[in-house]
């Protein structure tokens, strides 16, 4: 999004979402920045490509940044899984970006939580990620979240398309 000669901002989505999670922000930021919204393997349009690891994803994004952004970003942002990838990128190259925003990410390994999450998705994934569950979640959003956090219609369509395709491994 935006002119690729402007300062680069990369926004990395969390697990279960895709680039569209940052669509509203990208449209606003693109007036002054080149906004990059990668889709992680196993998500969105990349749902058929297995997500392997944070490290492999960091390798892929680092290559992209080297090839298309001169090896440097103005800002690097990530939420949840995206934030963990941001931390991995910054561990490898601390001067990769001028600004970093990390939200809702684990800062140190939590193997018990990981096992619990894997088991929960394995046991209840069909209840959490089915089209019916996604429609129900979208109906609850306006009731549970501040109005500005609820997905607009355009993003709801992406959500309904992509969430049921999310691999449950």
What do these predicted regions represent?
Residues 36-77:
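Active-site loop/oxyanion-hole signature of alpha/beta-hydrolase fold enzymes
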